[in-house]
Amino acid sequence: MSLPQSYRKITFADIALDDVARVDTFETLVDFVANYPSPDQKGLYIYGDMGVGKSFMLAAMAHELSEVATTIIHYPSFTIDVKNGIKDGSVKEQIDAVKEAEVLVLDDIGAEQFSSWIRDDVLQVILQYRMIEELPTFFTSNYSFADLEAKLSNGRQGDETWQAKRVMERIRFLAKEVHLKGVNRR
């Protein structure tokens, strides 16, 4: 299990269920853990405002799956690491480690410094592999599917709608979109 230190002890028991909007998402995650591994299992794309508990819930799921190689990646930090990996030739190794995780959580997707290279040669490669191998993939974001697609379409070359659609098609295949509402719990 590859989890940030602050997430390692979070369990389902730590999740506040005082808001009905959180219960459905929580129950979906509990079902995922109870039925893992199952070939029909799809990940979640949980989006919402900052501090509502998106990352917290997925950290609890990862902890509950501690026997499984679950990896949580803060996606903006990962993209910086990949860019820095160009110097030492570790880009492929870094991408392979993420794309091959048994269960993957891409945390805070859309918050990274956007570039066409990251979208097409990093994110799309990871998602394509996970789609073909049918590996469970979860996402957190402040962006809905539609908003993330719009963000991914704006490249240096102008309109890159088709490239963004390719990425979003893979995300939609891998995960069900869920809007998590609530108060900021930080």
Locations of regions flagged by a protein language model:
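Short glycine-rich substrate-engagement loop in P-loop NTPases that contacts/grips substrate
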Residues: 23-27, 62, 66-101, 116, ...
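Pre-Walker A (pre-P-loop) alpha-helix and adjacent loop at the N terminus of AAA/AAA+ ATPase modules
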Residues: 11-44
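Conserved ASCE P-loop NTPase core motifs with emphasis on AAA+ ATPases
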Residues: 1-13
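Walker B beta-strand of ABC/ABC-like P-loop ATPase nucleotide-binding domains
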Residues: 104-105
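Short loop/turn elements that form and flank the Walker-type P-loop nucleotide-binding site
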Residues: 39-40, 98-101, 132-134
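Walker A/P-loop nucleotide-binding motif
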Residues: 38-58
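Walker B catalytic acidic pair
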Residues: 108-109
